[in-house]
Amino acid sequence: MPKNRTGRSREAREKKRKEEEEEIEELNSQIEALSETVDHFAELPLTQPTKSALKNAHFITLTEIQKQCIPSALKGRDILGAAKTGSGKTLAFIVPLIENLYRKKWTSLDGLGALVISPTRELAIQTFETLVKIGRLHSFSAGLIIGGNNYKEEKERLSRMNILVCTPGRLLQHIDQAVNFDTSGLQMLILDEADRILDMGFRTTLDAIVSSLPVHRQTMLFSATQTKSVKDLARLSLQNPDFISVHENDTSSTPSNLNQFYLTVPLTEKLDILFGFIRTHLKFKTIVFLSSCKQVRFVYETFRRMRPGISLLHLHGKQKQTTRTEVTAKFTSSRHVVLFCTDIVARGLDFPAVDWVIQLDAPEDVDTYIHRVGRTARYNRSGNALLLLLPSEEAFLKRLESKKIAVERINVKDGKKTSIRNQLQNLCFKDNDIKYIGQKAFISYLRSIYLQKDKDVFQLDKLPVEAFADSLGLPGTPKITFGKLKNHSQSQKDYNSSTSLDSSEESEVDVENKQNVRTKYDRIFERKNQDVLAAHRQRLVEVNSDEDDGDFLQVKRVDHDLPEETGERFNANSKRKEKMASSKKAMLKYKKSADKVYFDDEGNAIPFYAMNTEDTFQKAGDPAALIASHLAEERKALEKADITDKETVRQKQLEKKRRRQELERITQQDATPDEYVPEGPIVAFVDDELPETSKKQKKWFEDNDERDHGGIVEVENLNSLEDQEALALKLMGAA
């Protein structure tokens, strides 16, 4: 029997293997013959598990980028794809990734087969979720490695992964430190938002990653604003790539169903316009972009305290990864909410049903503008975008026209404007932390303007700095100095490449910082001024500023008119007298008794036990009238106290009655201590000594029947030694 079972199992495995080989051969032949574009996923030469997963996820019709990319990617060609935001680029590389590994018979023993690199953690998480949704019926193992997660757990599971979705910094860390991480068998490399990964912020990181990957592989690059630089393509070793740009000939670089507006507003009225917009759009889902983390936090904290009537969220790169994931999930599931964020949300993230995208601060270039407004009007859904420009930033409109982006000018009626300057001043006055955050937001905004590359648009010298500080509610203008940078051009590149996406992007700077590991004790001893604010806060405002009210406990008077001690100094002739003179207890008999005094409003000392003179007593009135009035006041006080005492006694009696009734009810129900354990005030009425119900546990050889057998021991069978020993123990127990 076992031989036949084994034979059938081997035959079944061989049959299944032949069927898979025949299926793969048929798929390869269909892919080679694929020439016409198809409109539905069911018409593509895909495996049945992939088709079922696509159908269950309600992916039926192909988008333009998917029609052109998927057939070429299935044939193993390198691809450079560009399409508008919200056009389905993620699915355009997820489907070929799964199918190509399946046709190559990739298993867990073959190691890493595909690598997907995303510039931000949130985009990597979203890509991984899509991968799991489409490939859940296949047997591949997939992993997500991003900054903020446990490095040791990732390192242990890394060798078993076939597909990895990652950020550049964490991937390079594993390549340098993980011994079991082998990339020699890599088949596919995919760069999502490739133009962002290829820029200066990830230059050394990407070069280090590519140098450890095999040259012969399939490479695919996707973005809404794609690069065609020969130098960048040579870095990635692309071999005759297919340039696919489905919207290159369109009249606009943004979706046609996106309504785009701009508003010219002074710097001092930006927050007023934003708060008024939120108050009038309570039934919408809105994203507000700002240029720095400090600005995001200041606007969120102040608006949250002013309660505009809608849920507020904030997201920036300085938050922990768990917080960022929770905020992203909450914003995705909410219908009416406002999200204040930096550019970590600008690329690739797919938030459903976003109605408005507001750019409170102008983007650094047109590509950033396209990615920002791409968070709305996705998948043929309508959306709205509003750009707030300063009068000195109107040159940015020419940059938009050069990329075929038309925006409509709107104006705000004076009657609709509401100033929140007084409220911001009140918040900064009451809360020192809000004032500190506002000062940091002020500095970070000016720093971002100073480090921008396009000086025709961003002009720091034309900004009303003092009026801007006043509009934030600050008591004074913080000091800010722009020192001479050693390498100004490099600093601009670093700022535009790394700070625009904050610390969420895993740039090479992050990787270098991770090499210098600090222990928990190092961080504890490095802490300063934990109970108030950071040490550098004092340098934000002029020390002699008359408007600064943040200092608590200031010296008002330096020299006091204190009476000087007169008299000769006591000179002791012996050590005993000197010791006695230094003893307070011994010197008390030489000092007069202390007088208890109190001070009036003018600071005059008045004896506490000063006796009234006869004149003052006569001025108070007739003694009999004083006695009568005093007795009347005391009588009223006693009557009030009597009412309170009666109510207290009444409540105690009611509580005692309630306890007694509760105890009677428990007694009537015949509740045992095992069934009911009284709690609260009832415990006082229950005896502490409760009868024990548990009995001594019987041994294995004792009879479970509690009835008396009268000393009779029943014997059934004594064939074994164990039975005889059991009988002897029973007889001994009966005796």
From Swiss-Prot:
CDD domains: DEADc_DDX10, SF2_C_DEAD
Protein's name in the database: ATP-dependent RNA helicase dbp4
PANTHER family reported in the protein's UniProt record: RNA HELICASE
Modified residues (Phosphoserine): S500, S503, S504, S545
Positions of region (Disordered): 1-24, 483-513, 652-712
Chain residues that bind ATP: A83, K84, T85, G86, S87, G88, K89, T90
UniProt source species: Schizosaccharomyces pombe (strain 972 / ATCC 24843) (Fission yeast)
Motif (DEAD box): 192-195
Domain Helicase C-terminal: 270-424
